């Protein structure tokens, strides 16, 4: 890499890297470094009794701050549990006559961001801070790019690494400098573990189903399409795993569940990412009433396991997952929030309702989609506390069993929390003839232009023809659940690496383009370093200013390039250029 492409800090760090190697120190050793203690545990178990032998520890981590005070140096080391101060004195770490390790390695070659391992004893400083007195130090990894230095004073943060786009692109930096971010993802793991434990205690089996599918079934969504070269067939990234899990119920499992990575080629916003994690569970011999009770119990248990309470604040709103939850039919919900009773309405009448309410719609939408748009626009946002919206119209639910008392409805519920859907569940349709008819209705919607209509899966129908017991299934958006339990209002905050637009790169002319103006090849990187990334930007400044900046860089970095004069720079700027 050209030295001019580096910042001053990066140049200094690379010089330190070279100096370490010249001293015979490997800045990236391969050998295992034994760790027997961690920062939080050391502080928690410290015994300050002077009569007790000082505890010997071996810890490792990243340097987050350092203060050099002549023959002594204080550093703050960050490990998996937190941070702890370490204290290094010249004579303790270099007990002999040779003090070069302290004077050169500790004082000059260590930087914030470096990984080191230290061995020593635990003590309390005169200021009362529990620390490690270092007797031995090992370099584990040299950081050649500086971390953002976040400062804090009296509870106020300065120079914070807070720009959302930068944080999401460089999550590895975000995790290092913003400690609360790591806490979010630790809680995410706790949520998954708690849910998995709850299911396992019930005797249900965790399974894996295909991510690449020949038919993208189980949800109304637009799929990502790819191609299998060996088989020469199109394949789709999974939009849902529902139909495969139901096949397993046909095969004799009483209860199966899966945490699945799903992919939907649709919009991105604060609650949607094209790649997301869902959990789906299917239990034989149950119905949607049982599943509502089960879902309440599960969520209450998870909240207690992760937070120790069922209450949490999200955007200033207090949400309580304590069971039981309110239950409202979809027809009742629409009537409550619009004053219109849509029960029994046909497609034309629903379009009139949309027009009256100002709900956007188009000719590709069937009856179910129109009802969904009305509910989404006028009702959904009002359900802040956990609420089951039940008994959806049949047209909205092609995989759901017909309601036992009303043939126009289905036995389906969605759990609404904080104005968004969190979970979706059915009494599953197990009549193969009815299922085929529902798929054929979806095909008609597809022919009208609805690109979210479901595909016909003939193999799934064949599985149903062998017989599937009465079953209830439930799917839950894990990312949204984690958002709620960690008080986040954007899905990007609970995804380690959310999908992002390509990073913007400033336009930069090549050496060949500068050569057209007579700029020698060796001066092009210098122009770039000075901020003249294009010929046009070079032409916009006065020749004297351009020349002075180039000569300053030439001198500062000891490039040894031949001197410039005003006439030469003026000639570059005035040369014809297309």
From Swiss-Prot:
<dbReference type="InterPro" id="IPR004365">
    <property type="entry name" value="NA-bd_OB_tRNA"/>
</dbReference>
<dbReference type="InterPro" id="IPR006195">
    <property type="entry name" value="aa-tRNA-synth_II"/>
</dbReference>
<dbReference type="GO" id="GO:0005524">
    <property type="term" value="F:ATP binding"/>
</dbReference>
<dbReference type="GO" id="GO:0000049">
    <property type="term" value="F:tRNA binding"/>
</dbReference>
<dbReference type="GO" id="GO:0006430">
    <property type="term" value="P:lysyl-tRNA aminoacylation"/>
</dbReference>
<feature type="binding site">
    <location>
        <position position="414"/>
    </location>
    <ligand>
        <name>Mg(2+) 1</name>
    </ligand>
</feature>
<dbReference type="InterPro" id="IPR002313">
    <property type="entry name" value="Lys-tRNA-ligase_II"/>
</dbReference>
<dbReference type="GO" id="GO:0005829">
    <property type="term" value="C:cytosol"/>
</dbReference>
<protein>
    <recommendedName>
        <fullName>Lysine--tRNA ligase</fullName>
        <ecNumber>6.1.1.6</ecNumber>
    </recommendedName>
</protein>
<dbReference type="Pfam" id="PF00152">
    <property type="entry name" value="tRNA-synt_2"/>
</dbReference>
<comment type="similarity">
    <text>Belongs to the class-II aminoacyl-tRNA synthetase family.</text>
</comment>
<dbReference type="GO" id="GO:0004824">
    <property type="term" value="F:lysine-tRNA ligase activity"/>
</dbReference>
<keyword id="KW-0030">Aminoacyl-tRNA synthetase</keyword>
<dbReference type="InterPro" id="IPR045864">
    <property type="entry name" value="aa-tRNA-synth_II/BPL/LPL"/>
</dbReference>
<keyword id="KW-0648">Protein biosynthesis</keyword>
<keyword id="KW-0963">Cytoplasm</keyword>
<keyword id="KW-0547">Nucleotide-binding</keyword>
<keyword id="KW-0460">Magnesium</keyword>
<keyword id="KW-0479">Metal-binding</keyword>
<dbReference type="GO" id="GO:0000287">
    <property type="term" value="F:magnesium ion binding"/>
</dbReference>
<feature type="binding site">
    <location>
        <position position="421"/>
    </location>
    <ligand>
        <name>Mg(2+) 2</name>
    </ligand>
</feature>
<dbReference type="InterPro" id="IPR018149">
    <property type="entry name" value="Lys-tRNA-synth_II_C"/>
</dbReference>
<keyword id="KW-0436">Ligase</keyword>
<dbReference type="InterPro" id="IPR044136">
    <property type="entry name" value="Lys-tRNA-ligase_II_N"/>
</dbReference>
<dbReference type="InterPro" id="IPR012340">
    <property type="entry name" value="NA-bd_OB-fold"/>
</dbReference>
<dbReference type="Pfam" id="PF01336">
    <property type="entry name" value="tRNA_anti-codon"/>
</dbReference>
<feature type="binding site">
    <location>
        <position position="421"/>
    </location>
    <ligand>
        <name>Mg(2+) 1</name>
    </ligand>
</feature>
<comment type="subunit">
    <text>Homodimer.</text>
</comment>
<dbReference type="InterPro" id="IPR004364">
    <property type="entry name" value="Aa-tRNA-synt_II"/>
</dbReference>
<keyword id="KW-0067">ATP-binding</keyword>
């Amino acid at each position: 890499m050209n030295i001019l492409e580096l910042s001053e800090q990066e140049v200094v760090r690379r010089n330190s890297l070279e100096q370490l190697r010249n001293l015979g120190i490997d800045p990236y050793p391969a050998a295992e470094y034994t760790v027997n203690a961690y920062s939080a545990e050391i502080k928690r178990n410290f015994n300050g009794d002077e009569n007790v032998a000082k505890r010997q520890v071996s810890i490792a981590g990243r340097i987050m701050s350092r203060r050099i005070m002549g023959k002594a140096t204080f550093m703050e080391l960050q490990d998996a549990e937190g941070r702890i101060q370490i204290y290094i004195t010249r004579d303790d770490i270099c007990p002999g006559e040779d003090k070069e390790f302290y004077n050169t390695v500790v004082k000059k070659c260590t930087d914030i961001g470096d990984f080191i391992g230290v061995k020593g004893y635990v003590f309390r400083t005169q200021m009362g801070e529990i620390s490690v007195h270092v007797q031995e130090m090992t370099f584990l990894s040299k950081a050649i790019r500086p971390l953002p230095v976040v400062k804090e004073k009296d509870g106020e943060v300065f120079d914070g690494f807070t720009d959302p786009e930068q944080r999401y692109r460089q999550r590895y930096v975000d995790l290092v400098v913003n400690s609360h971010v790591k806490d979010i993802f630790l809680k995410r793991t706790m949520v998954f573990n708690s849910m998995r434990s709850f299911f396992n205690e019930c005797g249900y089996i965790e399974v894996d189903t295909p991510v690449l599918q020949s038919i993208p079934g189980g949800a109304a969504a637009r799929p990502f399409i790819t191609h299998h070269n060996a088989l020469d067939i199109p394949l789709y990234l999974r939009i849902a795993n529902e139909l495969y899990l139901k096949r397993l119920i046909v095969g004799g499992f009483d209860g199966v569940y899966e945490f699945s990575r799903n992919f939907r080629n649709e919009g991105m916003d604060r609650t949607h990412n094209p790649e997301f994690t869902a959990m789906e569970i299917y239990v034989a011999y149950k119905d949607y009433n049982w599943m509502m009770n089960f879902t309440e119990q599960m969520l209450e248990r998870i909240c207690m396991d992760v937070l120790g309470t069922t209450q949490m604040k999200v955007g200033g709103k207090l949400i309580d997952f304590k069971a039981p939850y309110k239950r409202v039919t979809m027809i009742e919900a629409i009537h409550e929030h619009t004053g219109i009773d849509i029960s029994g309405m046909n497609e034309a009448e629903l379009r009139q309702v949309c027009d009256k309410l100002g709900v956007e719609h188009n000719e590709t939408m069937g009856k179910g989609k129109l009802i969904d748009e009305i509910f989404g626009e006028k009702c959904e946002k009002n359900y802040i506390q956990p609420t089951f919206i039940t008994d959806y119209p049949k047209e909205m639910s092609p995989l759901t069993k017909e309601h036992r008392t009303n043939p126009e409805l289905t036995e389906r519920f969605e759990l609404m929390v904080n104005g968004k859907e969190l979970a979706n569940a059915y009494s599953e349709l197990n009549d193969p003839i009815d299922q085929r008819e529902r798929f054929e209705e979806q095909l008609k919607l597809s022919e009208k232009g609805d690109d979210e209509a479901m595909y016909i899966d003939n193999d799934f129908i064949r599985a149903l023809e062998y017989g599937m017991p009465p079953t209830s299934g439930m799917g839950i958006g894990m990312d949204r659940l984690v958002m709620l339990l960690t008080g986040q209002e954007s899905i990007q905050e609970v995804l380690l690496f959310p999908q992002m637009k390509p990073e913007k790169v400033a336009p930069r002319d090549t050496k060949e383009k500068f050569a057209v103006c007579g700029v020698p090849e060796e001066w092009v990187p210098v122009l770039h370093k000075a901020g003249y990334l294009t010929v046009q930007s070079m032409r916009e400044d006065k020749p004297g200013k351009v020349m002075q900046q180039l000569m300053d860089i030439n001198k500062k970095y000891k490039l040894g390039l031949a001197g410039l004069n005003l006439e030469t720079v003026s000639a570059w700027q005035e040369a014809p250029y297309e």
